From Swiss-Prot:
Belongs to the peptidase M20A family. Glycans are attached at N80. Keywords: Glycoprotein, Hydrolase, Metal-binding, Protease, Secreted, Signal, Zinc. It is found in: Secreted. This is Peptidase M20 domain-containing protein C757.05c. One of its GO terms (cellular component) is extracellular region. One of its GO terms (molecular function) is metallopeptidase activity. CDD domains: M20_ArgE_DapE-like_fungal. InterPro entries: Bact_exopeptidase_dim_dom, Peptidase_M20, Peptidase_M20_dimer, Peptidase_M20A. Zn(2+) 2 binds at D152. Its cofactor is Zn(2+). GO terms for biological process: cellular detoxification; glutathione catabolic process; proteolysis.
Length: 400
């Protein structure tokens, strides 16, 4: 297995670098792509499936993914990738709308693309174009494509785009069948998808969300309850603590009580988990802290209302208050496509912002969440092509 994968990786890397080599006057003139290579790991072998494509040589999934990853799009600064996608998708004959999310301090736009003039479609492929900090440059190492967003979630964006382009070239989708939606702000507060829910005025029967699921169908994922706690004390000399009140000590004690609380569990999603992400405050070691702050993130498996009540009992007091940053319940998803593996996920997505709509919702995408957000984020070549195949399969299943 190791030898077969390494040979495949070598062929892909050599082919890609020959294709994009600056030594050449331009892309190799192979006419039209005959290496729309989609690799599928089947049992103990790597099988190459070649799709004859109507897309010009040099215009392929790997080069689109490279372009996306090379554009820095940290949360709050996504305008360059939005503009790139608008130009790219228009060049493929799609109608493209930029939905303004905010203009201050920077322009932030969602991207919505479809065939012809029919804005409402049966299926929408959607993902997010923002990434976490810090930006990491694009590079290839063996069969791995590194860079910030290479996995989460520009692999999904690229694979979804090529799924639509290939289905168009194969004559399998018509106006009103399929659209693309790429949003900003997923990694921070979901502002992009919230704006879609409130203002886009487009309807779908099926939404396929793109996130790293190792190309498995998500059965469900945990919810988010994220909040900040502000504690208030009275500063005094630490030699006379009875004269004051330490905001830090109070905050720590309340956080320990939260950590010791048995939060609601789910048979499917497992336990709710708590992370005290940051604690800050105080002026010096010899002064009782007058102010303190903690950032808390609870991954909610069940009964988010009860968990919120617990947090408010602990932190909405005469000495402190909470500010809710994110509040979204656990999600239970559609996974009815025969022959596709499934997975339960501990992270959260933008799905809750559309969950009140009467439509089917799927979660699927290339890459592993374990490789996302870290200093060595990557997706493999085979994962990208498998993701492309998976999106096409899901679209066609729901258009049948």
């Amino acid at each position: 297995m190791t030898m077969k994968i390494s040979v495949w990786s070598l062929l892909i890397v050599i082919g890609y670098h020959l294709w994009m080599s600056p030594v050449l006057a331009g892309p190799l003139n192979f006419g039209y792509l005959s290496w729309g290579q989609h690799s599928i790991l089947e049992q103990d072998s790597v099988q190459l499936i070649s799709h004859q494509s109507l897309l010009p040589a040099g215009d392929n999934l790997i080069s689109l993914h490279k372009s996306l990853v090379e554009i820095e799009s940290l949360g709050g600064n996504e305008v360059n990738v939005s503009d790139f996608l608008k130009s790219y998708l228009e060049s493929k004959g799609l109608t493209v709308e930029l939905q303004r999310v905010s203009s201050n301090p920077t322009v932030r736009d969602n991207v919505y693309a479809y065939l012809g003039s029919q804005r409402n479609t049966k299926v929408v492929l959607t993902s997010h174009i923002d990434t976490v900090n810090p930006f990491l440059p694009y590079y290839i190492e063996g069969d791995k494509i590194h860079g910030r967003g290479s996995c989460d979630a520009k692999s999904s964006v690229a694979a979804q785009i090529f799924a639509m382009l290939e289905l168009m070239s194969e004559g399998k989708v018509q106006e009103g069948d399929l659209s693309l939606l790429f949003v900003v702000g997923e990694e921070i507060d979901g502002i992009g998808m919230k704006t879609v829910a409130n203002k886009l005025n487009a309807d779908w029967e099926v939404a396929i969300f793109g996130e790293p699921t190792e190309n498995k169908l998500g059965v469900g994922h945990k919810g988010n309850f994220r909040f900040d706690v502000y504690a208030h004390g009275k500063a005094c000399h630490s030699g006379y603590p009875q004269e004051g009140f330490s905001a830090i000590e109070f905050l720590l004690r309340q956080c320990v009580k939260l950590m010791d609380t048995d939060l609601p569990k789910s048979k499917l999603l497992g336990p709710s988990t708590i992370n005290i992400g940051t604690i800050e405050g105080g002026a010096a070691a010899n002064i009782l802290a007058a102010e303190a702050k903690a950032e808390v993130f609870i991954r909610v498996a069940e009964d988010i209302e009860t968990i919120r009540d617990i947090a408010e009992d602990l932190f909405d007091t005469e000495h402190s208050e909470i500010k809710v940053i994110q509040y979204s319940p656990p999600q239970y998803l559609d996974y009815d496509i025969p022959g596709m593996d499934t997975v339960v996920l501990a992270y959260a997505t933008d799905i809750p912002y559309l969950s009140d709509r009467k439509m089917k919702i799927y979660l699927f995408g290339p890459g592993s969440i374990r490789e996302a957000h870290g200093p060595n984020e990557y997706v493999t070549f085979s994962q990208l092509f498998e993701g492309l195949n998976g999106y096409k399969r899901m679209v066609m299943y729901n258009l049948r």
